[in-house]
């Protein structure tokens, strides 16, 4: 079947009342960004749904695949736009039915938004179903569990007919919920946390703490790849890479070994807090999960959060680990996250970290050195990369150049 339109159904933005126009406009912008590089289509965003008009050469599969990853879209259907007559509907219904397997079952589902259309919903279903039974052999009706369901929408401008419904990502359009800073470690949890807040319409920038020579270039490239995967859904994402070696060495030098993890996290939070204000964000996001490790108990979270007044969002706080792994696989970050390149947190993990840190003690340990000056140096020397869905690391660029030179 050759379709001439894609029907895009909105997610939660249909509930946004007087703000709906803002959400629709943002979604249309996100769709245009996602489809950049493709041609043969025109995006038409309307109040209650979006239509994408397709030319003959449009790559419908690639367009549909990209749309399915955009937050704010509930589902997508390749559709035929048909003139508003029973004759035209019947002719297209037969074309659909001619593709049915022998002895298969079908159902006609009609939605009539145009109440002035001369036939009501049930009359249309009977008329179109009867036409199929008369002209197509060895098929039958099954309204409960059909093999095929021909869907017909009678709207004010035209009639739209389709069979397939491709699930979207749901949620709200990214760009409607403000900006946050994601603490991206390179593990399984933080990319999922980033995806969860983006699903709520939030724009993210990411921060990663890099401690060479203790952490490798591969660990850095791993985080770049995770950011690239996230960017496939929302467009370019800024990744801020913090030189953290000086701070981390000093913490491990002067802080009691059981408290180094708590103090390290507090230093990270201080750096993130300064960057939040620089980039105009309103919250910090991390992948913490209650009770999963020593730094993620309530006592630890209290001690760590104390260094900032910026809201800290933890979208995975109550998830089971297995739930997080499933989501990681769904969004495509799992295989990258489990690559064996350690970040600065895992390399310096103490043997017996405190799970219920005494707040006064950690403050006392930190009081013996001037961490504020080190934090400022770390912020001043941040490396910022803009990661797109087709971003290539320096190593990948060099490899590609060698291949081109060889050819």
UniProtKB/Swiss-Prot annotation:
InterPro entries: Rossmann-like_a/b/a_fold, ThiI_AANH, ThiI_fer, ThiI_N, THUMP_dom, THUMP_ThiI, tRNA_STrfase, tRNA_sulfurtransferase_ThiI. Its EC number is 2.8.1.4. Pathway: Cofactor biosynthesis; thiamine diphosphate biosynthesis. Keywords: ATP-binding, Cytoplasm, Nucleotide-binding, RNA-binding, Thiamine biosynthesis, Transferase, tRNA-binding. It is an enzyme of class 2 (transferase). ATP binds at residues 183-184, 208-209, 265, 287, 296. SUPFAM superfamilies: Adenine nucleotide alpha hydrolases-like, THUMP domain-like. The keyword DNA damage does not apply. GO terms for cellular component: cytosol. It holds the Pfam family ThiI_fer. It is found in: Cytoplasm. One of its GO terms (molecular function) is tRNA binding. GO terms for biological process: thiamine biosynthetic process; thiamine diphosphate biosynthetic process; thiazole biosynthetic process; tRNA 4-thiouridine biosynthesis. Disulfide bonds: none annotated. Residues 61-165 form the THUMP domain. It catalyses: [ThiI sulfur-carrier protein]-S-sulfanyl-L-cysteine + a uridine in tRNA + 2 reduced [2Fe-2S]-[ferredoxin] + ATP + H(+) = [ThiI sulfur-carrier protein]-L-cysteine + a 4-thiouridine in tRNA + 2 oxidized [2Fe-2S]-[ferredoxin] + AMP + diphosphate; [ThiS sulfur-carrier protein]-C-terminal Gly-Gly-AMP + S-sulfanyl-L-cysteinyl-[cysteine desulfurase] + AH2 = [ThiS sulfur-carrier protein]-C-terminal-Gly-aminoethanethioate + L-cysteinyl-[cysteine desulfurase] + A + AMP + 2 H(+). NCBIfam families: tRNA uracil 4-sulfurtransferase ThiI. Catalyzes the ATP-dependent transfer of a sulfur to tRNA to produce 4-thiouridine in position 8 of tRNAs, which functions as a near-UV photosensor. Also catalyzes the transfer of sulfur to the sulfur carrier protein ThiS, forming ThiS-thiocarboxylate. This is a step in the synthesis of thiazole, in the thiamine biosynthesis pathway. The sulfur is donated as persulfide by IscS. Belongs to the ThiI family. This is Probable tRNA sulfurtransferase. It comes from Staphylococcus aureus (strain MRSA252). The lineage of its organism: Bacteria, Bacillati, Bacillota, Bacilli, Bacillales.
């Amino acid at each position: 079947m050759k379709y001439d339109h894609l029907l895009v159904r909105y997610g939660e933005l249909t509930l946004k009342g007087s703000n709906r126009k803002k959400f629709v406009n943002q979604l249309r912008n996100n769709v245009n960004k996602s489809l950049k590089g493709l041609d043969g289509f025109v995006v038409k965003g309307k109040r209650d749904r979006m239509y994408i008009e397709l030319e003959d050469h449009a790559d419908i599969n690639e367009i549909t695949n990209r749309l399915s990853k955009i937050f704010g879209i509930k589902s997508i259907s390749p559709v035929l736009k048909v003139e508003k007559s029973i004759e035209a509907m019947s002719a297209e219904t037969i074309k659909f039915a001619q593709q049915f397997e022998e002895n298969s079952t079908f159902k006609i589902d009609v939605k009539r938004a145009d109440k002035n259309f001369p036939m009501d919903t049930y009359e249309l279903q009977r008329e179109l179903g009867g036409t199929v039974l008369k002209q197509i052999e060895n098929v039958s009706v099954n309204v409960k569990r059909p093999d095929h369901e021909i869907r017909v929408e009678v709207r004010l401008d035209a009639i739209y007919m389709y069979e397939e419904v491709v699930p979207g990502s749901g949620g709200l359009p990214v760009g409607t919920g403000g900006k946050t800073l994601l603490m991206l470690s390179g593990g399984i949890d933080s990319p999922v946390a980033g995806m969860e807040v983006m699903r709520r319409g939030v724009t993210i920038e990411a921060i990663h703490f890099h401690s060479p020579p203790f952490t490798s270039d591969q660990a850095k490239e791993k985080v770049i790849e995770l950011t690239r995967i996230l960017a496939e859904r929302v467009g370019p994402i800024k990744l801020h890479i913090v030189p953290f070696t000086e701070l981390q060495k000093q913490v491990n030098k002067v802080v009691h070994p059981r408290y180094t993890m708590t103090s390290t996290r507090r230093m990270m939070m201080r750096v993130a807090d300064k960057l939040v204000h620089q980039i105009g964000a309103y919250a910090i996001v991390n992948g913490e999960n209650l009770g999963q490790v020593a730094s993620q108990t309530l006592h630890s979270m209290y001690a760590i959060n104390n260094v900032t007044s910026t809201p800290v969002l933890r979208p995975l706080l109550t998830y089971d680990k297995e739930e997080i792994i499933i989501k990681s696989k769904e969004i495509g970050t799992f295989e990258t996250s489990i690559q064996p390149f350690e970040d600065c947190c895992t390399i310096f993990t103490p043997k017996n970290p405190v799970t219920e840190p005494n707040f006064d003690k950690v403050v006392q340990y930190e009081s013996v050195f001037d961490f504020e000056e080190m934090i400022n140096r770390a912020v001043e020397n941040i490396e910022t990369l803009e990661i797109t869905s087709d971003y290539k690391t320096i190593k990948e660029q060099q490899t590609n150049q060698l291949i081109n030179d060889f050819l």
